[in-house]
């Protein structure tokens, strides 16, 4: 099962919906009903204690502000797109807009314009470096470095419809080297078609043009024609791509020229699996390749690659792991006609470092087996005895540092949540007693916060745990008269009245133990997941 290793970001601008426990698609009537429910509890005139009256006043103002924004069609649309920042900045939409559709269209136009401006303000660099190393050559004193290849490209948006990319390749071995410089100008002709002009100079000087058009909602066609400036040859390539399903696509490519070929390919990609394959017929023979990648956890994956053809036969096995937000490392083992290789890759953003290491040019079964088993065993040993303990220690250290930084903030939020729960207590108890009489839904225990801290609480470990807050009272308050409890998808639960964020920056869960028709049940949901109890069939 995949571990939760990072706090999900979730949809933006949902705090006011959480405050009133509303769905982002709530109707005007549902908004009014929720407002009345919360206002009856937190109205200051209903509170006798001076201390609690101050708490009630603060929460009542928050409820009124949420209702004022969500009940106003224009303000709600601005909030949904830009949040409180958009409202506080006094975003003007113009007096000519009166209908909801017009307002929404104008807001989306402004948002698109801002996104385009942001996109145009940034360059998009990509690059890769490949070092070819050879152990056999090193052992005979001939040096370990056998060659190097570098590729780099920078793309920039010139306007809404125009983009330019400038790049180059450089290759060198122990005796010779060379390079190619390339410039690409791309123009979006219409929403369904584009054209590119390509020019390169160096070892492969050429000029070319490529156009792409979306034929149907599921089909795309691309035609490319290029002329070599060195030998005058002309190459023509046609590619047809078809979306086969939501997660897979197929393509057929026909190339005419110096290297005429027909290629049929297939790709599939979903949340946990990525696969691709192609079959190629060319003048020099036949060839096929396949690649399968599976996500093993939220930060690691395994991969197998196979190639077979008239002059190729090899298989790759390996995997990779994300070591930071932007960096991934990968180790592959390759055995084939060219020999036995290890390949180490480092990916950071759009930059790649690839180091193939030739271990042996001969296919000795014992050596091939050892070359696979030794690094694999070493990896699992290091992972168990070095990497995991280190990562666990670092995770605890980060959690401790985060706790120290946010201690005061969390303490204040927890105090506000507990006072808000005190005001809910009377109504929550009354609702609970009503459910007891009808043998309905009764929340016996509800905890919100760090999943590990919740697990420790459930195992009977006592003591103050700052990673969790008890939310039994607000959960009983939110049980409807019909004996149902619903929290909406996409709404962060820390914004609900009587809740707070007990562990900022960490993933959170909501644990609920309840009885229904005198039968005990338990449920755990993520911070943005929907909760609906009792579940069907209970």
From Swiss-Prot:
Record's bilayer topology term: Single-pass membrane protein
- Name of the protein described by the UniProt record: Chaperone protein dnaJ 13
Q: What induces it?
A: Not induced by methyl viologen (paraquat), menadione, diamide, t-BuOOH, dithiothreitol (DTT) and H(2)O(2).
Show the coiled coil region(s).
Answer: 96-124
First-listed, main subcellular location of the protein, grouped into a coarse class: membrane
Q: Which residues carry this modification: N-acetylmethionine?
A: 1
Q: Which gene encodes it?
A: ATJ13
User: Per its UniProt entry, which superkingdom is the organism in?
Assistant: Eukaryota
User: Quick one: a GO cellular component term?
Assistant: plastid
Alphabetical list of Gene3D superfamilies matching this protein:
DnaJ domain (1.10.287.110)
| Stored SMART domains | DnaJ
Q: What InterPro entries does its record include?
A: AtJ13, DnaJ-like_C11_C, DnaJ_domain, DnaJ_domain_CS, DNAJC11-like_beta-barrel, J_dom_sf
- Family, similarity comment: Belongs to the DnaJ family. B/II subfamily.
Q: Which CDD domains match?
A: DnaJ
């Amino acid at each position: 099962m995949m571990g939760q290793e990072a706090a999900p970001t979730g949809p933006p601008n949902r705090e006011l919906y959480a405050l009133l426990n509303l769905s982002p698609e709530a109707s005007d009537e549902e908004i009014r009903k929720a407002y009345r429910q919360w206002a009856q509890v937190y109205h200051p005139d209903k509170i006798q204690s001076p201390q609690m009256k101050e708490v009630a006043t603060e929460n009542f103002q928050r409820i009124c502000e949420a209702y004022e924004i969500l009940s106003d069609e224009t303000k709600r649309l601005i909030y949904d797109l830009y949040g409180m920042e958009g409202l506080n900045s006094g975003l003007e939409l113009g007096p000519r807009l009166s209908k909801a559709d017009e307002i929404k269209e104008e807001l989306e136009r402004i948002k698109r314009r801002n996104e385009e401006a942001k996109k145009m303000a940034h360059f998009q660099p990509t690059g890769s470096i490949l070092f070819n190393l050879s152990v056999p050559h090193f052992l005979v004193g001939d040096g370990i470095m056998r060659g190097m290849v570098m590729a780099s490209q920078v793309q920039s948006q010139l306007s809404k419809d125009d983009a330019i990319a400038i790049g180059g390749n450089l290759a060198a071995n122990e005796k010779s080297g060379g390079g190619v410089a390339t410039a690409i100008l791309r123009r979006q002709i219409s929403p369904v078609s584009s054209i590119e002009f390509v020019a390169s100079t160096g070892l492969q000087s050429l000029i070319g043009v490529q156009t792409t058009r979306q034929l149907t909602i599921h089909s795309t066609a691309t035609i490319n024609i290029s002329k070599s400036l060195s030998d005058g040859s002309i190459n023509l390539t046609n590619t047809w791509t078809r979306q086969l399903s939501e997660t897979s696509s197929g393509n057929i490519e026909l190339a005419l020229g110096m290297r005429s070929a027909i290629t049929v390919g297939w790709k599939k990609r979903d949340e946990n699996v990525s696969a691709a394959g192609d079959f190629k017929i060319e003048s020099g023979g036949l060839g096929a390749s396949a690649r399968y990648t599976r996500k093993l956890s939220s930060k690691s994956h395994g991969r197998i690659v196979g190639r077979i053809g008239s002059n190729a036969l090899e298989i790759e096995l390996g995997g990779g792991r994300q070591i930071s937000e932007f960096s991934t490392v990968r180790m592959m083992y390759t055995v084939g006609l060219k020999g036995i290789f290890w390949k180490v890759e480092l990916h950071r953003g759009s930059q790649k470092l690839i180091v193939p290491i030739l271990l042996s040019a001969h296919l000795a079964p014992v050596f091939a087996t050892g070359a696979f088993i030794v690094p694999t065993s070493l990896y699992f040993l290091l992972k168990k005895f070095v990497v995991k303990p280190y990562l666990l220690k670092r995770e605890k250290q980060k959690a401790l540092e985060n706790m120290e930084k946010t201690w005061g903030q969390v303490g204040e939020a927890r105090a506000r949540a507990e006072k808000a729960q005190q005001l809910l207590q009377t109504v929550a108890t009354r609702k609970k007693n009503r459910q007891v009489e009808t043998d309905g839904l009764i929340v016996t225990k509800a905890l919100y916060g760090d999943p590990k801290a919740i697990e420790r609480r459930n195992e009977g470990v006592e003591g103050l745990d700052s990673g969790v807050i008890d939310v039994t009272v607000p959960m009983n308050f939110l049980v409807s008269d019909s004996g149902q409890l619903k929290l909406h998808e996409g709404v962060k639960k820390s914004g609900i009245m009587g809740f707070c964020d007990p562990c900022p920056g960490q993933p959170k869960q909501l644990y609920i133990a309840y009885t229904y028709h005198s039968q005990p049940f338990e449920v755990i949901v993520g911070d943005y997941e929907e909760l609906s109890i009792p579940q069907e069939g209970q």
